[in-house]
Amino acid sequence: MVQSNNPDSTSRYRTRRSFAKIPAVMDVPNLIAIQTESFKKFMDDGLTNAFADISPIESNTKDMCVEFGKHEFGEPKYSVDECKERDVSYQAPLFAEIRFINRETGEIKEQDVFMGDFPLMTPRGTFIINGTERVVVSQLVRSPGVYFSAERDKTSDKTIYNAKIIPSRGAWLEFETDKRDILSVRIDRKRKQPATLLLRALGIAETREEIIDILGDSEMVIRTLDRDPATTKEESLIELYRRFRPGEPPTIDSARTLLDGLFFNPQRYDLAKVGRYKINKKLEFDPENDASTLTQEDIIATMRYIVGLHDGAEGVQVDDIDHFGNRRIRTVGELIQNQFRIGLSRMERVVRERMSMQEPDDITPQSLVNIRPIVAAIKEFFGSSQLSQFMDQSNIAAGVTLSVVCPHWALAVCLVSAQASKFETFITPTTAACARLRPLKVLTSVLSARWQRMPA
């Protein structure tokens, strides 16, 4: 007799015993571990990282700030079964330690502030939202990093090359060639402009000779320099700001702040560890480089690589976008953390506005924090996101309920609600194909066609 050694499988149910003579090779793994472990990681580290991303929140005059400390959860008001019966959400109150610091006087006020009720995961890896069991499905996305692709131009039949630096959080940076052999840059999917404009704006190179020394004397580099409207760093900053934010009066300081905030501010831009690893590997950088934001070396190496692709250099090649090595899975913990960060960023603007409107002596952490943006962001995710779905359960309960009235109706409902491939042996293939589109109509036809043939 063999007894299962998996503690998860015996914690709530009877021990499964095997009377086979050949022992089991391995125990059945916990099939929902990807859900439970991801949410546990979010509870332990994800919330802390989300608070750290916006802390501290400084006033416009920099004389006051708000800092976030440790956080903790209270006890849920109802159990999982009670939440289902009462049609309420299974959630627990979230409290955060918030400090208000007046830098002029040195005064510090600290309070534990209620940040809203946060949905908790059940032992089954699901969530109870308004009494309904829901599950957050994982998302397959393109992994952060740098990717190079090529395609044929339909009019000129030339090969067009494209390079994308994709972060985990922040603005995309894209380089692309065109049929006129000009290298352009597109920042955060805005209008494209000559790529040399970005080099001058970042202060990497300013003169024509310096840019040629960095990128080489390729014909495409020469053509791009000829199309560049700026010749100095200041002109490049103004031109970049004018194209990125048309209608606003451009200044050098505002343009420099915009550029630094887009790619070099850790609070707004994050490559994540996997993104930095893939950039280091693709561009042959030092593996010890662990910068979470872009560096000037990243931009230079990316431009050199795409120039090499255009010129047919050896050792450079495009990437297969559909390869699973260039994709990753966003699990439930990361998805909720991203949504929680959106709520915090909305709250950040409210806190900054209230600091400028209230008297410093009357300000308390409780009076500054407005939890409505956070609550709304979490509610929006669980209620209307495509990744938050009703728990796909079998119809055992429904079948049992219907079987009390008529077991034949229960069988028909189970057939129609199952996948067509599972009940093609019971009904015709034509009806099975229609079941994917018109389940209620098929249910009627199944009942009318099979009613007489079913045994009493």
Which role does the model predict for each range below?
Residues K84, K441-T444:
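Structural and coupling elements of P-loop NTPases
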Residues M1-P407, A412-L415, I427, Q452-P455:
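N-terminal non-catalytic structural scaffold regions of very large proteins
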Residues Q419-F426:
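Short, basic/aromatic recognition patches
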